[in-house]
Amino acid sequence: MDNLQLWQRYQDWLYYHPNLELYLDVSRIPFDEAFLKGLEAKFERAFQDMAALEQGAIANPDEQRMVGHYWLRAPELAPNQELRDEITEPIAQIKEFVKKIHSGAIKPPNRAKFSHILCVGIGGSALGPQFVAEALSPLNPPLEIAFIDNTDPKGIDRTLAHLPLATTLVIVTSKSGGTPEARNGMLEVRNAYEKLDLDFPQHAVAVTMPGSQLDKYAQDWLTRFPMQDWVGGRTSELSAVGLLPAALQGIDIDEMLAGAKEMDMATRVHNLKKNPSALLALAWYHEGKGKGEKDMVILPYKDSLYLFSRYLQQLVMESLGKEKDLDGNKVYQGIAVYGNKGSTDQHAYVQQLREGVPNFFATFIEVLKDRQGDSIEVETGSTAGDFLSGLLQGTRQALYENSRHSITITIPEVTPRQVGALIALYERAVSFYASLVNINAYHQPGVEAGKKAAASILDLQRKIVQVVRETGTSLDLATLAAKIGASDQVEAIYKIVRHLNANRRSLTITGDLSKPETLQISTR
C-alpha cells in the first residue's frame, strides 16, 4: 500500500473511546475481508462466552470455578448479593484502613506513622502492584513502596537493608496462603523484625482467602483483607491485591476501577470494529495464525509504563500458554511476550526487529502528553518529547517498510483511569483470544507441575542429609543415590549437595569439582 492507502486503512480501522480518550490502531496488521469472514463464527462464540462468563458460568472447568474479575469494577453484575458484598465490603475496608494509616490512627509501636510499605508476594501478587506503583505513584507518596517477590536470600537482604523496618508496613499476599515463595519471604521478614526486637504482627497485614493457612497465621496481625476464590492471581490487580498498596501510596483507586469499568463496557459490544479487546484478539490471531507463531513485543514510549511488558508477560503467557484445548486435544497454544520501553529499545533489540528474524509483531503504546508543565526546546522547534514521538512514529514506519507488523495504542496521559483501562483492555483481549482458540485461560497446570517438582527436590534433600548423617562415612554420588533409593536421580543429588556445600550447611564435598563422579560427600 502507498501512504494514502495506508491513511485510508488507518481511518477505516481506527477505534476511539471518547470518555477514555484512548485510540487503538490495528491498521498495520494486514488482515483482509476474507480473513474476517472466516472468523465471524469464532467471534460470535467468543462474544457469547464472555457474556456467559460475566453471568457466572463455570469458565474454569478444570477447577469448577466461576471467573469474576470483571465484577470487581462492576459489582452490580455479580450474579447474587453475596458475591456483590464480597466485592464492595473489602473496598470499604481498604479505604478505612488507608485513612487510618495516613492519619496515624493506626501506627507502628513507639512511632508517629508508617513511612514505607513492603509487599511480599510473587507472580500476580507482585507484578500488578509493581506495574501500578511504577506507573502511578506520586513524586512524594504518603508511603514509599518496596517489594520482595522472590525466595532469593540475597535479594531479600538487599531489600530489607534499604527499609526503616520500625516504620514499614508489611503486606503479605498469597491467595492460597501456602505459596512457598510468599511464605519464605514472610518468614525472612519476620525474622528481620524480631532481630531488631520489633513486634512483627503490629507491622503486618495479610491479603489472602478466608480460611487459608495465611489467614489463620495472621490472626494477630493488624488486619486481613480477603481474596476471592473466583479471582486468579494474574487478574487480581483490581482486587485487594492491587488496590490496597495503590491506595496506601495515594493512588486514586476509584479512578482505576472507573477506567476498567469503562473499558469493560466498551468490550461488551458484539461488533468487532467497535470492540477494542476483540480487535486486539483479532490482531493476535492473524499474526500468529491462531497458533502463537509470532511473539508479542510491547514497546511503551513512556518511562512510567516500562513494567507493563512484565505485567502482560504473565497475564498473556500464563493464560494462553496451554498444552491442551478444552476438548482435550494437544494444541500447544501460547504467545510469547517481551519488551521494555521506547526509545531505549531502539538502542537494544529494535535492530533485530527491523532486519532479523520476522517472528514477532509489535505493540507501540503512545502517551500524548509529555509532562506536567512546559518543555524547553532541545533543538529549534523541537522538545525532548517531540523526539520521543518522532522515534515512535519512525520505528513504526521502519518496521512496516520491512513487512514487520504492529499495533498502536494511544492514551492522553498516564493516570489511574488510563491504567485501569489498559488492564481491562488486555484482560478482555486474553479472554476473547482464549475463546477463539478454544482453551481454558484461567488455570495454570504448568505452574502447579513446577511447584510439585520443586517440592520433590526438597524432599530428596531431606533424605540425602539423613542418609549421610546416619552412614557416618563419606559417600560418592552413585552410592548415595542407591542408599536413598534414587539411583536415577544422581544429577539432582549432585546439584543439591553442591548447593548445601556452597552455603556451608549440613554436608561438605571433596574431590575434583570438574569431575563430579570423583566427589565424596560427608557431614560437615
Swiss-Prot record:
The keyword Isomerase applies. GO terms for cellular component: cytosol. It is an enzyme of class 5 (isomerase). Its EC number is 5.3.1.9. The keyword Isomerase applies. It is found in: Cytoplasm. CDD domains: SIS_PGI_1, SIS_PGI_2. InterPro entries: G6P_Isomerase, Phosphoglucose_isomerase_CS, SIS_dom_sf, SIS_PGI_1, SIS_PGI_2. Gene3D superfamilies: Glucose-6-phosphate isomerase like protein, domain 1. Pfam families: PGI (PF00342). GO terms for biological process: gluconeogenesis; glucose 6-phosphate metabolic process; glycolytic process. Belongs to the GPI family. NCBIfam families: PRK14096.1. Catalyzes the reversible isomerization of glucose-6-phosphate to fructose-6-phosphate. This is Glucose-6-phosphate isomerase. It comes from Microcystis aeruginosa (strain NIES-843 / IAM M-2473). The lineage of its organism: Bacteria, Bacillati, Cyanobacteriota, Cyanophyceae, Oscillatoriophycideae. The gene is pgi.
